[in-house]
């Protein structure tokens, strides 16, 4: 069975962990940006279907929020 010859240093471990976390953070930001563009109807590269029931309910919610202000 293959076993590493020497122990990995703390700094190398931290560097690898930071790279892994940065990749996860980047993909999360990309997904959040796509979600924001879809919600604000500014998406140009993402196609989706609109359900009439959801569309009508969202309009009533948005107008009720404006009335409360």
From Swiss-Prot:
Protein name in the entry: Large ribosomal subunit protein bL32c
Membership in a protein family: Belongs to the bacterial ribosomal protein bL32 family.
Entry keywords, A to Z: Chloroplast, Plastid, Ribonucleoprotein, Ribosomal protein
Record-linked InterPro entries: Ribosomal_bL32, Ribosomal_bL32_plant/cyanobact, Ribosomal_zn-bd
GO molecular function: structural constituent of ribosome
Species annotation: Marchantia polymorpha
GO cellular component: chloroplast; large ribosomal subunit
HAMAP family: Ribosomal_bL32
Gene this protein is translated from: rpl32
Disulfide feature: none
An annotated GO BP: translation
Transmembrane segments: none
């Amino acid at each position: 069975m293959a076993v590493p010859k020497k122990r990995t240093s703390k700094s190398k471990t931290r560097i690898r962990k930071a790279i892994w976390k940065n990749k996860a953070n980047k993909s999360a930001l990309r997904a959040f940006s796509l979600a924001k563009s879809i919600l604000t109807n500014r998406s140009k590269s993402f196609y989706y279907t609109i359900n009439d029931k959801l569309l009508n309910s969202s309009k009533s919610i948005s107008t009720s929020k404006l009335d409360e202000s």
